[in-house]
């Protein structure tokens, strides 16, 4: 359900669905975007119609992120060349984009967490976040001059700025977290390692005087960028679930 579109045929934000709908005692989480069937049977009968998903993805990303990316297709798309090529186009784009692939069930859990989360103020620019479930990101708008104060925050893994908005990544390993912000100045404090972006999900970040450790999992190559590191050489060691290790030195 949902069938969100925001393109030349549906040129309004009003065509974007809500996160969910309440059905009796249950909550139905909508798919983020319309599926291939909607695009190929919208009146034009266009076999290439699913390509127009790209317009919705771009329109809901800028100037403000409104929806996640959702490549929702059916196996019968393989029956026609144009439909199959459209699916391949979006999957290839997703592999190259700076996104974090998650299972559909994980997205539904994140959406459920949105409705359960409780945020309370602990003072100036400081908040306690509780009962968030699988929701691990919060966004602050119109804070171009603020950043995370990692010295006062608890359970915060990272931050990333998008325009005047600040996205803050929370640690799944902590039930309750504290998010503190402070003016973004060169002398804001001692650097602390933090996640900028990554194609995997991360949890249980433990910062130490000479480094840090974190658990990660996901799909595909584990590409990631970290900030807050002092200049110098770092020994990077990775262990899989079989305790097999990989080591590399990075500057």
Where do the model's predicted regions map?
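Short, basic, helix/turn surface patches
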Residues: 20-42, 128-135
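Non-catalytic C-terminal accessory domains or segments of carbohydrate-active enzymes
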Residues: 93, 98-251
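Catalytic domains of cell-wall/extracellular-matrix polysaccharide-remodeling enzymes
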Residues: 1-28, 84
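A structural signal for short secondary-structure junctions
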Residues: 22, 30-32, 50-53, 61-67, ...
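Flexible loop/turn segments at secondary-structure boundaries
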Residues: 5-9, 77-81, 110-111
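Catalytic grooves of carbohydrate-active enzymes
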Residues: 30-106
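Short, surface-exposed, charge-dense and proline/glycine-enriched linear segments
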Residues: 2-9, 31-35, 130-143
